[in-house]
Curated annotation (Swiss-Prot):
InterPro entries: DNA_mismatch_repair_MutH, DNA_rep_MutH/RE_typeII_Sau3AI, DNA_rep_MutH/T2_RE_sf, Restrct_endonuc-II-like. It comes from Pectobacterium carotovorum subsp. carotovorum (strain PC1). Sequence-specific endonuclease that cleaves unmethylated GATC sequences. It is involved in DNA mismatch repair. Gene3D superfamilies: DNA mismatch repair MutH/Restriction endonuclease, type II (3.40.600.10). SMART domains: MutH. This is DNA mismatch repair protein MutH. The lineage of its organism: Bacteria, Pseudomonadati, Pseudomonadota, Gammaproteobacteria, Enterobacterales. GO terms for biological process: DNA modification; mismatch repair. It comes from the Bacteria. NCBIfam families: mutH_TIGR (TIGR02248), PRK05070.1 (NF003458).
Length: 231
């Protein structure tokens, strides 16, 4: 097994990416931060994306938070997912920012959500709060694409949520909408407003929204992965 190495170039193919990710499994965040020469924050309250930034150093990711995937040349998106001692996800997973205007004629097939979730490298990370940040270990990664059933679940929720946005109902959408995909505000502060369509078709200002995968979607996905590892 390779030891963790900081990569400044993107992986040439999917297998190379998986091998880079596998080399991180079992290491804790303090060890990896030391190798990458990245300061370890006291906690993630002000540095929510820090783990992703750290792992990108070892994986050679390039896209950041752009609409394209993290590894555009090979069509793979990186998602870190905090898990508890049972391997269950501790929180929802951000997919992408939701477009609140200019949505006439938009389809699931051409959506950012579908594009981002077409091929995902999931990296589980210990996330229980009683474990100090530096001692949290990286889990075994998996590369995943949605099954037909999973894609259908995602499409149904996406279409329902987008219909509400287009019909000027964005402010009535709650986190309870959607079986596996939810829409909720994504802003560090409540002053960051963006334009949307109001109830009567008028322009309004509202908080930016993001699409998130619910734990009911990611939990069985991870459970299958960990079951395969133990067999």
């Amino acid at each position: 097994m390779n030891s963790p190495t900081v990569h400044t170039t993107a992986p040439p193919h999917e297998q190379a990416l998986l091998e880079r990710a596998q080399s991180l499994a079992g290491y804790n965040l303090a060890e990896l931060a030391d190798i990458a020469r990245l300061p370890l924050p006291a906690n993630l309250k002000r540095d929510k994306g820090w783990i992703g930034v750290l792992l990108e150093r070892f994986l050679g990711a390039s896209a950041g938070s752009k609409p394209e995937q993290d590894f555009p040349d090979i069509g793979v998106e990186l998602k870190t997912i905090p898990i508890d001692e049972q391997g269950k996800p501790l929180e929802t997973t951000f997919v992408c920012v939701a477009p609140l205007t200019g949505n006439s004629g938009v389809t699931w097939e051409s959506s950012h959500v579908r594009h981002k979730l077409a091929r995902v490298l999931w990296i589980p990370v210990e996330g229980s709060r009683h474990i100090p940040l530096g001692e949290r270990r990286i889990g075994t990664p998996l590369i995943w694409s949605p099954s037909e059933e999973e894609e259908e679940q995602l499409r149904c929720d996406w279409e329902e949520l987008m219909d509400l946005i287009v019909l000027g109902q964005v402010e009535s959408i709650t986190a309870r909408h959607g079986e596996v995909l939810q829409l909720r505000p994504k802003a560090a502060n409540s002053r960051a407003l963006t334009e949307a369509i109001g109830e009567f078709g008028q322009p309004i200002l509202t908080l930016p929204r993001g699409f998130y995968l619910k734990k009911t979607f990611t939990a069985p996905l991870l459970a299958r992965h960990f079951m395969q590892l133990s067999n």
